[in-house]
């Protein structure tokens, strides 16, 4: 048997006295794709950060090739050929794509040629001279992967790499992963998507509560076994009565929808989209599908006031808000959950309690009790895993960070809730909770506009789906007509 590229033995780690890794063993072979699954807070990202030298273990040993280490640092990890592509791309927004890829990379005469080779291998059309701040999340992910490839990574860690990629981009990434396998690169593939895991990974490990509870060849396990290993208790995917009680929105909700739409958009044109019209009524969930670059996020950001439209008008409950500031639109009940929670959504070093109520701050003498009550409400309703409300958001897992952001949006008393990739980085067992949460919100006469790259999410959830292609609507599907094939056909500019 070939010597493994990587062996982690009895890795332990605590944060604030809470054990997040409990004696983890993990092995990666040359040319192997080893999938890593687990619920939010299971410890997947922490384990990978330890392997990449970003975090320091409390105990345990890492063996890379023939060398054993008690701990690594990022520079040493890079020297050893380890590269972590994080769940949230970490780019320098004011630098170009080329500068981001080559940052701190030793200069070589063949650097430009090597970079062009990598771009061709990825079949990547990204503009190297563009500013990183202009990139969609999918392109940011590609930049991170290119960083690793340019550093001759022998161990590549991909943390939810397809979370915001379209099917075409995902397949292109998979082709590159297979090419890397042929070069004996070992790949750790963290994902919640079982079809992708079965397509790529020969081996799988499942983590729960900081421990590896299942590990072996992927083909040896059924989907039900893998899901049950993550969530041992059978879950009813409908929200419990207790959860529904805790999710009752603040403020005065209308008991009956009005005879006019909550949102009305006429001939709206802006950066990335042209002449869009839209009406959403109270209690309706409208899906907005399309490929990355189709203009969905730009449209949502314009509705919220983050971008200035070139033409068109916007009404919220029959009051024109076209010229209102973002703050004014928020005060009127238009609430937006952004695509990238770490860059545009959360204050990572601030505590959970402050992040949750920041849209709806109480008077200072009420603040402590109010924040504690709000954190408790959403801790119960959404199952947010945290030690207490003073815990910095940065220390939470990606899925729990997303739940904090959702809690903030709900606490802002929305009339219209726009959610951009709401289940990005959220595990299999928690996705159903978010779907039911959106249904519960809509049942309280809130209008919901949902953007997602995972078109499967719209089936059975959206009342109707609008599909965008190159900045325009390519079609609209009623609830009974919503299928993955029809949405993808429209997304590529075809006729459903």
From Swiss-Prot:
Catalytic activity: ATP + H2O + (2R,4S)-2-methyl-2,3,3,4-tetrahydroxytetrahydrofuran-[AI-2-binding protein]Side 1 = ADP + phosphate + (2R,4S)-2-methyl-2,3,3,4-tetrahydroxytetrahydrofuranSide 2 + [AI-2-binding protein]Side 1
Classification via CDD domains: ABC_Carb_Monos_I, ABC_Carb_Monos_II
This protein's record includes keyword Translocase: yes
Any single Gene Ontology cellular-component annotation: plasma membrane
SMART domains referenced in this protein's UniProt entry, alphabetically: AAA
Gene Ontology MF terms: ATP binding; ATP hydrolysis activity
Cell location: Cell inner membrane
Residues annotated for ATP binding in this entry: 38-45
Source organism superkingdom: Bacteria
UniProt-listed Pfam families: ABC_tran
Key words of the record: ATP-binding, Cell inner membrane, Cell membrane, Membrane, Nucleotide-binding, Repeat, Translocase, Transport
Main localization of the protein described in the UniProt heading: membrane
Entry-linked Gene3D superfamilies: P-loop containing nucleotide triphosphate hydrolases
Domain ABC transporter: 6-234, 255-495
Enzyme Commission designation: 7.6.2.13
Bilayer topology annotation: Peripheral membrane protein
InterPro entries to which the protein is assigned, alphabetical: AAA+_ATPase (IPR003593), ABC_carbohydrate_import_ATPase (IPR050107), ABC_transporter-like_ATP-bd (IPR003439), ABC_transporter-like_CS (IPR017871), P-loop_NTPase (IPR027417)
Summary of subunit composition and partner proteins: The complex is composed of two ATP-binding proteins (LsrA), two transmembrane proteins (LsrC and LsrD) and a solute-binding protein (LsrB).
PANTHER family linked: AUTOINDUCER 2 IMPORT ATP-BINDING PROTEIN LSRA (PTHR43790:SF2), CARBOHYDRATE TRANSPORT ATP-BINDING PROTEIN MG119-RELATED (PTHR43790)
Protein family according to the UniProt entry: Belongs to the ABC transporter superfamily. AI-2 autoinducer porter (TC 3.A.1.2.8) family.
Function according to Swiss-Prot or TrEMBL: Part of the ABC transporter complex LsrABCD involved in autoinducer 2 (AI-2) import. Responsible for energy coupling to the transport system.
Identification of the protein by name: Autoinducer 2 import ATP-binding protein LsrA
């Amino acid at each position: 048997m070939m010597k493994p590229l990587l062996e982690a033995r009895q890795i332990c780690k605590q944060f604030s006295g809470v054990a997040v890794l409990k004696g983890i063993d993990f092995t990666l072979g040359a040319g192997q794709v080893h999938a890593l699954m687990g619920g939010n807070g299971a410890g997947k990202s922490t384990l990978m950060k330890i392997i990449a030298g970003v975090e320091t273990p409390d105990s345990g040993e890492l063996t890379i090739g023939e060398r054993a280490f008690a701990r690594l640092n990022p520079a040493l990890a890079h020297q050893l050929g380890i590269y972590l592509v994080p769940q949230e791309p970490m780019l320098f927004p004011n630098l170009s794509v080329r500068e981001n890829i080559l940052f701190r990379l030793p200069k070589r005469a063949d650097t430009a040629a090597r970079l062009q080779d990598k771009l061709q291998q990825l079949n990547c059309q990204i503009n190297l001279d563009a500013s990183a701040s202009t990139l969609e999340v999918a392109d940011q992910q590609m930049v991170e992967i290119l960083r690793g490839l340019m550093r001759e990574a022998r161990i590549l860690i991909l943390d939810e790499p397809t979370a915001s990629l379209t099917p075409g981009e995902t397949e292109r990434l998979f082709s590159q992963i297979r090419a890397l396998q042929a070069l004996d690169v070992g790949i750790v593939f963290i994902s919640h998507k079982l079809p992708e895991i079965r397509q790529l990974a020969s081996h799988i490990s499942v983590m729960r509560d900081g421990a590896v509870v299942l590990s072996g060849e992927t083909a040896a396990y059924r989907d039900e076994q893998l899901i049950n290993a993550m969530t041992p208790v059978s879950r009813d995917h409908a929200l419990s009565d207790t959860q529904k009680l805790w999710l009752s929105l603040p403020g005065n909700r209308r008991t009956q929808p009005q005879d006019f739409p909550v949102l009305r958009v006429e001939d709206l044109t802006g950066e990335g989209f042209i002449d869009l019209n839209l009406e959403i009524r109270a209690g309706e969930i409208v899906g907005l599908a399309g490929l990355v670059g189709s203009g969905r996020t730009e449209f949502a950001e314009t509705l919220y006031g983050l971008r200035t439209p070139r033409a068109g008008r916007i009404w919220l409950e029959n009051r024109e808000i076209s010229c209102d500031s973002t703050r004014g639109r928020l005060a009127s009940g238009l609430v937006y959950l952004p695509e990238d929670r770490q860059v545009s959504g959360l204050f990572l070093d601030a505590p959970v309690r402050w992040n949750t109520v920041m849209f709806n701050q109480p008077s200072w003498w009420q603040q402590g009790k109010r924040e504690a009550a709000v954190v408790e409400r959403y801790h119960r309703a959404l199952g947010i895993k945290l030690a207490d409300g003073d815990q910095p958001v940065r220390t939470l897992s990606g899925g729990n960070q997303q739940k904090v952001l959702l809690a903030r949006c709900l606490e802002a008393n929305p009339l219209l809730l726009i959610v951009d990739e709401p289940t990005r980085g959220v595990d299999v067992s928690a996705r159903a909770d978010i779907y039911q949460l959106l249904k519960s919100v809509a049942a309280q006469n809130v209008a919901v506009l949902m953007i997602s790259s995972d078109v499967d999410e719209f089936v059975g959830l959206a009342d109707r789906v609008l599909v965008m292609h190159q900045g325009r609507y390519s079609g609209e599907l009623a609830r009974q007509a919503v299928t993955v094939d029809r949405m993808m056909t429209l997304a590529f500019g075809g006729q459903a």
